[in-house]
Amino acid sequence: MRTEESSYRDMYSKSRRSALPSGTEVPDFILRSTPDQWLTLSEFRGQPLVLAFYPADWSPVCGDQMTLYNEMLKEFHDLGAELIGISVDGAWCHAAFARDRKLHFPLLADFEPKGDVARRYGVYRDKDGVSERALFVIDAGGKVFWSYVSPIGVNPGADGILSALEELQSKNAKVAAGTK
């Protein structure tokens, strides 16, 4: 007999296996960053990037998560990284959410076709019509350095992102110095 908890565990473990793994070249995309502007992933080539997929604007956990990342922007920038949030909400919804939360990083609308980018990154929840709460650290060459899929109701915090960015920075410094 399957319990709700075991079904959740199965769904969670399946979603974790489907997220793009380390070393995978990330698919480029173009999404709305405002109702009249577009942003492409390729604009960030040459620098580390944090992609934070989240289920929906205005949900309590998503609001707390994006607010935390806004507070951590200086640390991300100090480690050479930019931050982008992505959900299936529309650009107008993102604009209101970002204004309300005083966010200072782009929120991209994976709205039409709904969830297309999340699907390509392996983090779309077909049953719910939203993306997983998934994090990717992408290196300057456009490959996944680190990824994590959090349970949908849990704020993953920023520690994993910071650790991955520090590790990436250390790796890059060793490569630049000619050591491995």
What feature does the model see in each segment?
Residues 1-180:
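Chalcogenol-based redox active-site neighborhoods
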